[in-house]
């Protein structure tokens, strides 16, 4: 009963796509435009605590600590010596020029919105020198020698080639705020006039989150592009016609855009699990297009007219595709039950993506086939005839 009902629905879809292919194309394109706009609202999520169950006592306590005592994330700014050809280069991190630059950097960081406090072990040297930076390295050494050994070890490393500045941020899981804070911190670092022979690098959890954000976006673009090119090459080898090779790929590409739109609409973030969703959907969804195209070509070789070949391909292939989609979606939706939010997000996105592949392939691909057969191919033949 259910199968018969599905076959009847598929038959109507096939007739609509065959009789009004341009209208079907227009409908799909309009939806795709809105999905593309929604996809721009997808947020990146690199906060480790957001990837864990939010009702866990450890995570709840973390949020309480942030609310009561401010930021818990530390940006560690490492100031260290580096090779330099300059005759004026720094050879000892205790150089007063370095200390003055550190003091200036600290003062500038305090004005960054989102930085709650800034501290450096070097501060104690300034305090011991009546609140000003010593003018010569010998004074710095004298102050250090008068300090207890445990304090002295926390200011510089053993060979006096490195020290750190710690900046505390209250950005927490707010991804946009953290990215803005890191941009401002890096800008302050660039503006600070450190002498030659000194390298300044921000590290710690916030900088690593920014790096992860950049790498996720880069990986998403790269893997999707590589997957797209690889699939296109295989389709060209299989179908041996450029136009027929592109057609099964277009619905899957549109499904990827729809998936991005759904992520923006449902507030599903781009995280470590969902970053590769584009290539994943391409790999899973292209099967549907290949099966439908192959069945259509098979029916045409038997001598069937376009309308009958489209109907047979959509109905016969469509029922199998819908069954395959249902089983795949159930498998992906099982991930929604996972305690890790990012695994649940992956399950949701994969289920949406493969469902969109099915819908777009069964509606748009028949319309594209009809447009190719009835409009594009005759036009190409006429153009070839005119040139001859």
From Swiss-Prot:
Keyword Cell membrane in record: yes
Cellular component terms (Gene Ontology): plasma membrane
Chain ranges passing through the membrane: 22-42, 219-239, 246-266, 273-293, 320-340, 351-371
SUPFAM superfamilies, alphabetized: Multidrug efflux transporter AcrB transmembrane domain (SSF82866)
Signal peptide interval: none
Keywords: Cell membrane, Membrane, Transmembrane, Transmembrane helix
Lineage: Archaea, Methanobacteriati, Methanobacteriota, Methanomada group, Methanococci
Cystine bridges: none
Annotated InterPro entries: MMPL_dom (IPR004869), Mycobact_MmpL (IPR050545), SSD (IPR000731)
A family per Pfam: MMPL
Compartments it resides in: Cell membrane
Major location (coarse): membrane
Protein name: Putative membrane protein MJ1562
Family that this chain belongs to: Belongs to the resistance-nodulation-cell division (RND) (TC 2.A.6) family. MmpL subfamily.
Record has Transmembrane helix as a keyword: yes
Bilayer topology term: Multi-pass membrane protein
PROSITE patterns: SSD
PANTHER family linked to this entry: MEMBRANE PROTEIN MJ1562-RELATED, MEMBRANE PROTEIN YDFJ
């Amino acid at each position: 009963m259910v199968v018969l009902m599905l076959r009847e629905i598929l038959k109507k879809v096939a007739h609509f796509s065959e009789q009004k292919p341009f209208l079907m194309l227009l409908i799909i394109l309009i939806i795709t435009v809105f999905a593309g706009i929604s996809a721009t609202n997808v947020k990146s999520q690199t906060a480790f605590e957001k990837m864990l169950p939010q009702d866990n006592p450890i995570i709840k306590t973390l949020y309480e600590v942030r609310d009561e005592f401010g930021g818990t994330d530390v940006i560690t700014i490492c100031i260290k010596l580096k090779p330099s050809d300059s005759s004026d280069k720094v050879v000892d991190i205790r150089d007063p020029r370095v200390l003055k630059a550190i003091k200036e950097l600290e003062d500038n960081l305090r004005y960054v919105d989102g930085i709650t406090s800034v501290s450096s072990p070097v501060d104690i040297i300034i305090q011991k020198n009546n609140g000003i930076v010593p003018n010569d390295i010998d004074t710095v050494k004298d102050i250090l020698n008068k300090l207890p050994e445990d304090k002295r070890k926390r200011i510089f490393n053993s060979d006096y080639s490195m020290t750190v500045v710690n900046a505390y941020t209250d950005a927490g899981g707010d991804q946009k705020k953290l990215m803005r804070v890191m941009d401002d911190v890096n800008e302050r670092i660039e503006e600070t006039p450190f002498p030659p022979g000194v390298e300044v690098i921000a590290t710690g959890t916030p900088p690593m989150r920014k790096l992860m954000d950049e790498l996720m976006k880069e990986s998403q673009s790269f893997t999707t592009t590589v997957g797209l090119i690889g699939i296109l090459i295989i389709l060209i080898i299989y179908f041996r016609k450029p136009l027929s090779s592109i057609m099964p790929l277009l619905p899957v590409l549109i499904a990827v855009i729809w998936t991005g739109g759904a992520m923006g609409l449902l507030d599903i973030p781009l995280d470590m699990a969902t970053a590769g969703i584009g290539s994943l959907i391409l790999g899973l969804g292209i099967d549907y297009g290949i099966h439908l195209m192959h069945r259509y070509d098979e029916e045409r070789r038997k001598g069937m007219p376009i309308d009958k070949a489209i109907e047979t391909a959509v109905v016969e292939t469509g029922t199998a595709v819908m069954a395959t989609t249902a089983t795949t979606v159930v498998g992906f939706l099982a991930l929604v039950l996972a305690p890790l939010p990012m695994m649940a997000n992956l399950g949701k996105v994969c289920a949406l993506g493969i469902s969109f592949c099915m819908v777009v392939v069964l509606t748009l691909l028949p319309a594209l086939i009809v447009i190719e057969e009835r409009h594009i191919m005759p036009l190409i033949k006429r153009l070839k005839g005119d040139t001859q």
